[in-house]
């Protein structure tokens, strides 16, 4: 009788749990919840792991919608990151329901082979990826301290094995002036909305001088409440992105000058507050990414060639913070979205369609087989364990 390999066993587990995983994906999709408010999604995601015998730690780092569920006691601790927050107004247009379900599928598959491979499987529920930096907060809380390597996937319109992302920071800028009647005594007012306008004009002019890879985008979240009242308070929210964290910091310094210009020109006071932890750029582990690429090909997928991956436009993710700390991957698994891209309503609909269901199942298998390959490679296993020891 032929020997059943660990990879085959893991794949069989995913096939056996297909119905549960797709049901989880659809259930999360049907009840979208925003950052730090994903209570139902968090509970659903950890439930399948708990039923399998995972030891669940609720609310690590004091985050109510985070969790860590562990199985096994091997020295090679593998973190599998689940996301489940949605977007305001358009639900799961980033497909985090697929991410959560594939993370659970990967964890269940690896639990079946954990003892034989010397693994500890750590399913980590990470809230607030869209805004809030849940993974960055969990890193600060020590949740990743014992993790040797971390994996997750993200849906998208194409397959990318070694996905990149942009570094990101987000700030809220509040201008405080003085109210007055806009017709009777406008000269007694200090117009906070004008400060916003000056800042936006300065930012618009700055865009001509931005370095390659730098970009910024923002919204006015408060600008007055009545046309006959000089606005005494106005507020902006801006995101700054760049190819790496150093370039992002340089952009942020220049943006702060634009914000200050609004205050100086109008006489307003101003305050800049970081809206969330900064997101670092993804640094995919090359060995893990190449194994995942081979798994994509084995599944009949056609990943973007390695030599053009860096040129594929992407957003930002707090998984970048994880991959800057330890070996990890964040591949993109393609689904048929009818031409829509993430953060469009068309992608919301696609994220619960047949192609999305296929991504859940195939993604679970590909991630699980990639981890098995790591565990079975003495050289790579030693490498990631040595890197973890160096962090201690």
Kindly label every feature range from the protein language model:
Residues 79-81, 176, 330-334:
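Non-cysteine beta-strand/loop elements that form the S-adenosyl-L-methionine
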Residues 58-60, 129, 162-165, 311-313:
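Short Gly/Pro-enriched turn/cap motifs at secondary-structure boundaries
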Residues 65-68, 85-93, 97-98, 104-106, ...:
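Histidine/acidic-residue-rich, glycine-tolerant segments that coordinate divalent metal ions
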Residues 14, 18, 42-46, 103, ...:
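Hydrophobic face of alpha-helices
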Residues 45, 49, 102-110, 135, ...:
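Buried hydrophobic packing segments
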Residues 2-5, 197-392:
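Metal-dependent amide/peptide-bond hydrolase catalytic core
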Residues 2-119:
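Acidic/His- and Gly-rich active-site-bordering loop/insert found
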